[in-house]
Amino acid sequence: MKNPIKFLFSSEESDTKVANNRLLSYAIGLAGQNMNYNFVSQRLFVFLNAVMGIKPEKTGWITSVSTLWDAVNDPIIGTLIDSRKFKPGRKLRPFLLYLPPLIGVLTALMFFDFGMNETQTIVMVVAVYLMVDIFYSVQDVALWGMLPLSSPHSEERARVSQWVAIGAGAGASIAGLFPTIKDMIINSGLATEKNAYFIGAAVFGFGGMIISMLAYRMKEKVYTQAEERESVLKTLSTLRYNKTLIIICLARLLGGITLTLPWEYFFESQGISYHVFGLELTGGTMQVLYGLIPGIPGAFAMFFAAKFANRIGGMKKVLVISEIGQILIRTVAFFLGSNDRFLNGGILISIMVLISIMNIPINMKDIAHRSLISDSIDEVELKTGERTEGISFSMQNFISKLTSAESKFIQGYLLKFLKFDNNVKRPAGKNPIGYQTGRFLKYRWHQFMLGPVVGSILYLIVILFLDDDREHMAEVERQLKLKREAEQPQEEAFEMIEAES
């Protein structure tokens, strides 16, 4: 058995193989970035609505409009990155070093209570969000765009995709600890709820961005350079040659149409406490456990995603299996926990076991998306002579943020439909989630367990049209290798990249 320490810190590399120590730094960098992203995406809506007291529909508009701007900004940034002049090995790496500290500071400011009224708070949050978005978009496109540049070979890129997905998932899980940390801070009297959110933003937002700087150690191993600026419109027009990217983007966009709320609105509703193995757990603690424990099998399975995909016949089948599994398992879990049976410890554990099984292929989805898109960039290069890391991965970011925006928009009106009252009578200093009645409580389990099924059905319909032919991809690699060798010998190209790095 290999020594895991030697394996992770191995510096062995070639023109096609990524050194494990660089891959580890890249994965940790993605973990840091996802700490920031997940804290903001999961907590900003709740912070503005339940903590700062902004009305649900206004909160929905703030977060959805801000995220829409964020989404539209990404393709512009990606196109500009692809069309600019750069030297070999320096297309994306510089952005990974200089932008994170600024992004981290701006993130923390979004969660600071300046003591302003509702209108002033809305203006401040939107203004800061728009500023942070520009810098975040550049860094985000550069981080993920490094994946197709990591190696000219599909199998090695799949390995890189697998490890960075593990890093990203780890970062999201770390950020998911916030509810428990928040409860501990508040219950110990160390800070108010507002200040607890600011502490979270400082730790996960700013701290995560500092950690993300480690990704700068990754190298660009696919020889590419632009001695002259390309037309922005020409760069953007290459998207029409990328059928894989278009199908994945459409599937993800439709998959974001879910009738569900952030987890806090379920786990903290009506001051619920959960009785498990004789222990009484708070809603915040149960939320962390529900995210952490069922996520363990899926996190472990990510280490074998590439092998699993090869065994079943490709990454497309991973995507299909993940959605069918989610539809079936969520439906079974809904009936198992209906009529408030989810409050029973034994029932809840059974549901968590089902969700654990569901999460195994679900956690492989992002690996499959990125692996397929990295391969599609090679296909576009063969057709057009242009490499499109910037625009291709900015489109993925665009869709991520567009789906987030549509989700936030739906959440605002779903709260209104459920008659959520953020002025409900409650003890001083307590957020209103735990004191709701009526329709909100009646449908809390429906929205939590069945809401995501709507998006899964829509996603599955579209993804069935995706092509994933391994023999065709091998031929693309062969032709590209001949093309690159004709333009510049691979050894010489690699030496240039090494020197520039």
Task: Give short role names for the model-derived ranges.
Residues 2-500:
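Membrane-embedded alpha-helical bundles of multi-pass transporters/translocases
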